[in-house]
């Protein structure tokens, strides 16, 4: 048995993987380069710092993100438990106070006696020495990226991701906005900034004319479609934003009794409710232009920005050529990958792959062969995608029903209602997941 386990990266995936190993009685070395060396996007030395949104997506029952979180919960996810404890109001979504979340993850991980935290940059990987989980995330350092390229035999793939601005709550003119949840589902947790056509056109023109941050390396940018900067969306057509992040449907303005022409939504950032982020407003405009354009939004005329939108490069491996369905390298079986560097996109997906990698590496450490989760589960569908997608055009993916197996033809003919179909898919997935957990993860 090889009981020596190293986990590189104390982000979402790395912390979850370390916890899964520790709860199975295994000793872990967890490496984190911050604060010795930071990244362009991180602001603290805390583990599991959320650098983009503070949302862990839908908590609505029988949605694909809900299914993935339910499997994680049944599998004993630490970070999901902490997310629930540090949640902030966000309608049908699970959003967290990002500071409280990262602080609590750090506290719990550092207090676990089986986890030894090592602060400093890892630049070399000995694939024959120890069982290793690489969970360094999309902002992996250059030196370690070169080492991963050596292991993988090829260069990394990448896309560009961007971050939304955050404003002080006290700087929002509440007389010009209203609280609501879309279609009045759940509690009215979002601040909604309504626009008429004239206001929208003025905002759009200013957005298109604004200047982006200059950087030679950002020529011919390759964006992740699920997180496009708003200026890129705007260039695709004058109404594109109104059918995207500024979609007004389901958000009745109490002053008019109608849907606005367009809406900007603000989501609470922390438990103190002293700051809000602009939902879906990731961008990489110059700060001066960004402030000028965002202050054209009704209610934000005097907004004070705690953080401006920005862009950063996200690195990931070509998983279909490199990994098995247990997140293990085909050519180097002592090495596992987890998190966004493995080719998933999203906080929850990163935690889930960390959870799986922790389970699998623990099984190997105890002298057994790991068993991949069933294809019918959200876990299984996620790893099926990253391991079997077309390698030539591989891009990171979120969990969606498109990744999960569809009902058979007879069931589809019998059940026409989309919500009922989704419920049936979730029910089947959880049944398969429970069976897999009971029979294959024997070292819980």
Swiss-Prot record:
From the Swiss-Prot or TrEMBL record, give the protein name: Methylenetetrahydrofolate--tRNA-(uracil-5-)-methyltransferase TrmFO
Q: Which Gene3D superfamilies match?
A: FAD/NAD(P)-binding domain
State the EC number(s). 2.1.1.74
Question: What GO molecular-function term can you cite, just one?
Answer: flavin adenine dinucleotide binding
Which family would the database say this protein is a member of?
Belongs to the MnmG family. TrmFO subfamily.
Q: Give the reaction(s) catalysed.
A: uridine(54) in tRNA + (6R)-5,10-methylene-5,6,7,8-tetrahydrofolate + NADH + H(+) = 5-methyluridine(54) in tRNA + (6S)-5,6,7,8-tetrahydrofolate + NAD(+); uridine(54) in tRNA + (6R)-5,10-methylene-5,6,7,8-tetrahydrofolate + NADPH + H(+) = 5-methyluridine(54) in tRNA + (6S)-5,6,7,8-tetrahydrofolate + NADP(+)
Give Gene Ontology CC terms.
cytosol
In its UniProt entry, the species of origin is given as Koribacter versatilis (strain Ellin345)
